[in-house]
Design a protein with these regions (language model features):
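Residue(s) in the substrate-gating loop at a strand-loop-helix junction
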Residues: 77
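Basic, low-complexity intrinsically disordered segments
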Residues: 8, 32-41
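Nucleic-acid enzyme cleavage-core boundary/entry regions
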Residues: 1-2, 31, 35, 66-68
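An acidic, glycine-/histidine-flanked metal-binding catalytic module
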Residues: 1-29, 138-211
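A glycine-rich, hydrophobic loop/mini-helix early in the fold
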Residues: 38-74
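Charged, alpha-helix-enriched surfaces in structured cytosolic catalytic cores
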Residues: 9, 13, 46, 50, ...
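Generic solvent-exposed, charged/amphipathic alpha-helical segments
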Residues: 15, 19, 23, 52, ...
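Long beta-strand-rich cores associated with HINT superfamily self-processing modules
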Residues: 66, 81-186
Length: 211
């Protein structure tokens, strides 16, 4: 096992464990027949090339990565509606299996690029052969519309190294505004949407019972 494998193994363990736990939250809502504020959960460990690039840009030595780079372990929690994000953040604050050490609200404080999301930095303990180890992880909570925009912007940022042509920058700004308006409109009819989803779920369950 090389140096990078040894370094990243605890992060992979943390992501795997956190995905199970956070997905379990959604399942608990479903079992209780309550509407879940969580649409789905994803997770990943930052690629080695991305870690090296970020470390070089910020002057972080290898032996300080575990303390100074908080997003090597990353998770995303998707919500249907903007106000679901506050619910999810409150749930994370109340967890006893990890410690919230920092929060960054890019929804009320939108980045200049148009990026919107809520970031929660946590310290998560894992058990290893050498004892307990504390891992920093970043949980991003956002709506589906926010995620669509962020995914496209992330891809373009790599292509242009963050220096967008004026036309691309203009279109990204317009797309960010459109994503914001979509979230606003969906929030206005949230009750109707959730009622329809509940009706569909119940109807599908009855169909399976009769099959």
């Amino acid at each position: 096992m090389n140096q990078w494998d040894q370094f990243l193994t605890p992060y992979k363990q943390a992501v795997d464990e956190l995905k199970v736990k956070l997905k379990g939250l959604r399942k608990q809502y479903e079992v209780g027949e309550n509407t879940s504020p969580i649409e789905f959960v994803t997770g990943r460990v930052k690629p080695i090339s991305s870690i090296i690039d970020k470390a070089n840009k910020r002057g972080i030595p290898f032996d300080r990565l575990h303390e100074e780079m908080y997003d090597i372990a990353g998770l995303r929690m998707m919500c249907q509606f903007v106000d679901d994000i506050d619910v999810v953040v409150d749930i994370l604050r109340q967890r006893r299996d990890f410690k919230v050490i920092e929060e960054r609200d890019y929804i009320r404080n939108t980045k200049e690029s148009g990026y919107r999301s809520y970031h929660v930095i946590i310290e998560y303990p894992i058990e290893t052969l050498n004892g307990q180890k504390h891992i920093l992880a970043e949980i991003q909570i956002r709506t589906l519309a926010m995620n669509f925009w962020a995914t496209i912007e992330h891809t373009l940022r790599y292509k242009y190294d963050g220096d967008y042509p004026d036309e691309i920058q203009h279109r990204l700004e317009r797309a960010a505004e459109a994503a914001y308006l979509l979230d606003e409109e969906m929030s206005e009819i949230k009750d109707e949407i959730q009622e329809a989803q509940k009706y569909y779920t119940q109807k599908r369950a009855k169909k399976h019972e009769n099959d």
